[in-house]
Swiss-Prot record:
Subunit and partners: The complex is composed of two ATP-binding proteins (HmuV), two transmembrane proteins (HmuU) and a solute-binding protein (HmuT).
EC top class named in words: translocase
Pfam name, any one: ABC_tran
Assigned GO CC terms: plasma membrane
Subcellular location: Cell inner membrane
Protein name in UniProt: Hemin import ATP-binding protein HmuV
Ranges annotated as spanning the membrane: none
Entry membrane topology: Peripheral membrane protein
NCBIfam families: PRK13548.1
Gene Ontology terms, MF aspect: ATP binding; ATP hydrolysis activity
Taxonomic classification: Bacteria, Pseudomonadati, Pseudomonadota, Gammaproteobacteria, Enterobacterales
């Protein structure tokens, strides 16, 4: 692998992707640095999940390139990529009666048996899944399944000595109650500060993005229309223009970050 020359973990340049004659992603460039959380936001149909699939290498762009740690993502050996990059999809269903612990253990498959149980125990505790450990995954609520899937991808990236890695999450809080939304994003924020981890997630909740993201990319009909800090992106003019919603903006009483509310 090429040496990492700076803090950039992921660099996407001029990504474009179409289905038939429909342009889904149109000339998008962005970067994600280690030690930060990047949020991708945008209205329904903006192309957020498709962009995430391009960034992770699950699909190939028709134009442009995505580099992970300085190397084109398609050039990474599959097993090495799996130990360095993990993806939590929006929906994950299972047909067979796996226990929660067995689902979490799937994340360790790129590592073999090395440190397997330590990794599983660590991430189950981090994600507040201790009480779910022996339950049938199929019988869990949507929010509980979401926490288990987060534990799985964290297990995939767990190393006894942390290494540079990238975590991609597609709406990781969409099914969670308030406590677990806060618990999850506090955990993810802490991990990016304590480890050389870069994190990129699709979020619909703009207030969570404002509180926890270091950078925000706003997507609209496949185009990147705004990028910057929460302060720079989450303003009245930008949000009204691209979301077409009657909204207002106030300030969080503790952080002074923008907080969005819908008018009655």
């Amino acid at each position: 692998m090429n040496a990492i020359k700076n803090n950039i973990s992921l660099q996407a340049q001029n990504l474009s992707y179409s289905i038939g004659n429909q342009k889904i992603i149109d000339n998008v460039s962005l970067s994600v640095n280690k030690g930060e959380i990047v949020a991708i936001i945008g209205p329904n149909g903006a192309g957020k999940s498709t962009l995430l699939r391009l960034l992770t290498g699950y699909i190939k762009p028709e134009h442009g390139q995505c580099d992970l740690h300085g190397t084109p993502i398609e050039q990474w050996p599959a097993e090495q990529l799996a130990r360095t990059r993990a993806v939590m999809r929006q929906h994950s269903s299972l047909s067979f009666p796996f226990s929660v612990e067995e689902v979490v253990a799937m994340g360790r498959s790129p590592h073999g048996i090395h440190h397997k149980q330590t990794a599983i125990d660590t991430v189950i505790e981090q994600t507040d899944c201790q009480a779910l450990r022996h339950r049938d995954y199929r019988q869990l609520s949507g929010g509980e399944q979401q926490r288990v899937q987060l534990a799985r991808v964290l297990a995939q990236l767990w190393h006894p000595t942390p290494i540079e890695c990238c975590l991609f999450l597609d709406e990781p809080t969409s099914a969670l109650d308030l406590y677990h939304q806060q618990h999850t994003l506090r955990l993810l924020y802490r991990l990016t500060r304590e480890q050389p981890m870069a994190m990129c997630c699709v979020l619909h909740d703009l207030n969570l993005a404002a509180l926890y993201a270091d950078k925000i990319f706003l997507l609209h009909k496949g185009k990147l229309v705004a990028a910057g800090t929460p302060e720079e992106v989450l303003n009245d003019h930008t949000l009204r223009k691209w979301y077409q919603a009657d909204l207002g903006i106030t300030r969080h009483p503790e952080t002074q970050q923008p907080q969005i509310y819908l008018r009655q």
